[in-house]
Amino acid sequence: MSDGRTGAGEHDARTAALDRLVARMVGAGPLRFTVAEGDDERDLAYRLRHDAVLSRGWASADELDGGREHDAFDPAAVHVLGWDGTTAVCAGRLVLPPGPLPTEEACELVVEPRGQVVDVGRMVVAPSHQDANHGTFVLLLGGLYLEVRRRGFGVACGMMSAPVRAMCRQLGCRVELLGPDRPYWHEVRAPVRFEVGRDAAGLVERWGDDEELSER
């Protein structure tokens, strides 16, 4: 098992190639990704989450906070926003160590390596940008991946539904199940762990081109 935080000596060619591949994929897409700065941009993430919860029937408006969905982890979290022009259309959240992380708290477990894991969650896409191919959601995953890597981490965890786990498998990305499915954030999800270096070679072979392969 590798350390969660990756230094220069551990940032091997395969992982670097995957980082470049994801950066190119996200950069070629129609969205721009940023980290929310200030209360106004955080509020955009909370409102996107609110709208997602309502549209899926997970909660009623009376159960939510004035058009916002948020919890105790949000003030210290990193919120990643995806923009279509000047409109925020998707969002996700990173809760940084040392923890306890949301997944650890919900499932009463510790994700190893302790204190070196980023919790990825609260991923939502505006109804206007949802489609059968889940293109915006895949780009959001890429934007969150890049932010995790930018902060020097190589291991992530989260609560993931069975359909999203299946999507990850189709993309060639293995997620390690840490426990059984259970109700979490209005849906049945299971705790999972993802290690960057584990699948880097296979992902680059599958989705990369000659540039990535030659630079490995």
Locate predicted features.
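Charge-rich, low-complexity intrinsically disordered segments
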Residues: 187-216
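Short, P/G- and charge-enriched loop/turn segments at secondary-structure junctions
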Residues: 66-70, 106-109
